[in-house]
Structure formats: structure tokens, C-alpha cells
């Protein structure tokens, strides 16, 4: 798999600015990642399937 910042439906990073411990690990696992953590202020995932979109500065569509 790959690693990176998962994105929401708007193409924005998943924020962990106000979330508790374990939030990003849960969010990443919902996206079939092996694990994740809060790379404050956004979630970062490890072991993502190649089909899952991750944040890319070049093609960022976040509004």
C-alpha cells in the first residue's frame, strides 16, 4: 500500500485539529489503511490501498 494524507469528499485533508487520540487511526482504518495518526493538524495514514485518494499539492481541489 501507500501512505499519505487521506482526503474527504471535498478533496480536503481530514483534520484532527479538535479530535481525541485514536481518531485518525480509526479514520484511516475506515479507508482500509493499516494504521494512522494525527500529523497535526491533519490525519496521516499508512498502508492505504492504491485506490484511495490522498492529498496532493499539485492536484489539490480543496476549497
Swiss-Prot record:
Pfam families linked: Toxin_3
Tissues and organs where the protein is expressed, per its UniProt entry: Expressed by the venom gland.
The name this protein goes by in its record: Insect toxin TbIT-1
GO cellular component, as recorded: extracellular region
CDD domains membership: neurotoxins_LC_scorpion
GO terms (BP aspect): defense response
Family: Belongs to the long (4 C-C) scorpion toxin superfamily. Sodium channel inhibitor family. Beta subfamily.
Disulfide-bonded cysteines: 12-62, 16-38, 24-43, 28-45
GO MF entries: sodium channel inhibitor activity; toxin activity
Record-annotated LCN-type CS-alpha/beta domain positions: 2-63
InterPro entries: LCN-type_CS_alpha_beta_dom, Scorpion_toxin-like, Scorpion_toxin-like_sf, Scorpion_toxinL, Scorpion_toxinL/defensin
Role summary: Beta toxins bind voltage-independently at site-4 of sodium channels (Nav) and shift the voltage of activation toward more negative potentials thereby affecting sodium channel activation and promoting spontaneous and repetitive firing. This toxin is only active against insects.
Location(s), subcellular: Secreted
Keyword Disulfide bond: yes
Domain topic, free-text comment: Has the structural arrangement of an alpha-helix connected to antiparallel beta-sheets by disulfide bonds (CS-alpha/beta).
Keywords assigned: Disulfide bond, Ion channel impairing toxin, Neurotoxin, Secreted, Toxin, Voltage-gated sodium channel impairing toxin
Amino acid at each position: 500500500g501507500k501512505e499519505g494524507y487521506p482526503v474527504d469528499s471535498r478533496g480536503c485533508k481530514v483534520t484532527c485539529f479538535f479530535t481525541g487520540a485514536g481518531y485518525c487511526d480509526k479514520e484511516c482504518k475506515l479507508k482500509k489503511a493499516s494504521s494512522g495518526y494525527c500529523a497535526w493538524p491533519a490525519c496521516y495514514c499508512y498502508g492505504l490501498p492504491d485506490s484511495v485518494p490522498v492529498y496532493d499539492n499539485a492536484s489539490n481541489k480543496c476549497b
